[in-house]
Amino acid sequence: MSDAGGGKKPPVEPQAGPGPGRAAGERGLSGSFPLVLKKLMENPPRETRLDKEKGKEKLEEDESAAASTMAVSASLMPPIWDKTIPYDGESFHLEYMDLDEFLLENGIPASPTHLAQNLLLPVAELEGKESASSSTASPPSSSTAIFQPSETVSSTESSLEKERETPSPIDPSCVEVDVNFNPDPADLVLSSVPGGELFNPRKHRFAEEDLKPQPMIKKAKKVFVPDEQKDEKYWTRRKKNNVAAKRSRDARRLKENQITIRAAFLEKENTALRTEVAELRKEVGKCKTIVSKYETKYGPL
């Protein structure tokens, strides 16, 4: 055909449309890609296989070493935290772990009842151990002991309170002072009751009434009795009065002797206590000087 100018038009090339040949080529490429990926996964390259095998061997060696160390210290509970997995970027693999196998491998009982049965000892064994050893050890409990600082603080406070408590008063009669006192045996005999125990000036205590001054008894006026009136009744009365007077004189002399010997012992004891107190005061003075020097050098206590 020719246009209005009389020239010829150039031939138009046909455009490639979605024909059957192009669609078949694209379908072949998409179908071959999964096959290649599958072959690569089934048969990986040699380098990656060697790296995986090295990582597995290293992991097995670490597990065997940890198992040997745990077998040695099985009685002390194996330190699970010391068992590490090497990580070098490529040989780290997450695997499925069974809890029962993990507990069995580390020597930990699976059930808590089994744990309590293993920890508690039989009664016969405990009694045998207590009789054999002087120090009795308490059986281990299944629960772990928790440290509580409040208990220690309360125990220290109670001990300090016990130390600060004033001691109970001491009976002076129970205190014995080492005094060099050796009285005359004759004086001891005169100070003792006839037929009784020997007088002990170290332990004898007088009542307050005994130490009070005795009242003066006025003597009765003498009555002159002629010889004609001195009958048996007179002489019996006279003998009774003489016996009573002798008894009172003996009791008074006995008490006087006892008081004298007791006073001599107390004087000796007093001098011994005074010397002891003087020595204690000297020692306290030395301690005070030491404390004052310490305070001047290091500050108050």
Swiss-Prot record:
Anything else known: Mice deficient for all three PAR bZIP proteins (DBP, HLF and TEF) display a dramatically shortened life span and are highly susceptible to generalized spontaneous and audiogenic epilepsies (due for example to the noise of a vacuum cleaner) that are frequently lethal. The down-regulation of pyridoxal kinase (Pdxk) expression in these mice may participate in this seizure phenotype.
Family: Belongs to the bZIP family. PAR subfamily.
Modified residues (Phosphoserine): 30
Region ranges (Basic motif): 233-253
Annotated function: Transcription factor that binds to and transactivates the TSHB promoter. Binds to a minimal DNA-binding sequence 5'-[TC][AG][AG]TTA[TC][AG]-3'. Also activates the telokin promoter in smooth muscle-specific and calcium-dependent manner.
One cellular component term from this protein's GO annotations in UniProt: nucleus
Recorded GO MF terms: DNA-binding transcription factor activity; double-stranded DNA binding; sequence-specific double-stranded DNA binding
Organism of this sequence: Mus musculus
Name used for this protein in its record: Thyrotroph embryonic factor
